[in-house]
Amino acid sequence: VAACTWSCTRVFEVRDPHYAFALVWLLAAGLALAWNSRVAAHLVAIAAIPWWIATALHQPGAESSFVLVDGAALLFGAGLGLAALSGERASSFGAVLAAHGAISLGVAAGLEVAMAGDFLHSSVSLGHPPWALAGGVAGLVFTVVAAFVSRRPGFGYAAGSIGLVLLGAAAWQVRPGGEPWLAYALQLGAMVCLVVSGILDAVRPRIVAGWIGFAGVVAGITWAVKGSLLGRSAFLALAGGAAIALSTVLNRRLPRGRP
């Protein structure tokens, strides 16, 4: 709590990311891992989120949403990397980090669509700051390695989810004359991959995160799309119908408990 307060109050003092917090966070993560405490693991995972939010507030325009996406991808990927290890302590700690990272990724994806859409036709930069993008790519690498080591298909879909979210930044850079449907499609595809990942691994937090992200992206698209109210309503109805159909199909793959 003290480290989070220390880091967040720097928002009013300097604009540079507070990298010293990362050292404190790593120390806390090491203690949570050594204690093998699930409560401590949750606290450590939650503590990372305010730092990324405070750091994102320093960024101009839509870049703040991209920073949040990169932070969520790093937290999610690092968690999956630890969850793929054979040790019970590391696996349990990684599962907690991955759960919080997945939910953060879903929320950040919706914010990215809404915020980037507002700045699409302006001269504001639409992309990831290099240092933040490095964190997002690291999260993707961790997930790919975890999928290769564990041979779990759910991890592969999780890697696809992170990759599609990161690719969305490249699609925003194109700045088409009309609507950036490619960027929208990448974000929706990323959230579907997140849902499928949770279903294949029977991890409900990941399933919930995927549906939260899907709803957030649809809401962001509805907000960002320019045009008549009728056109937005038609898109929202179409997206809602697709979500119902998709949930019906995927629900058949959910693990069933014994009666």
How would you name each of these model-derived features?
Residues 1-259:
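Alpha-helical multi-pass membrane segments and their bilayer interfacial helix-loop junctions
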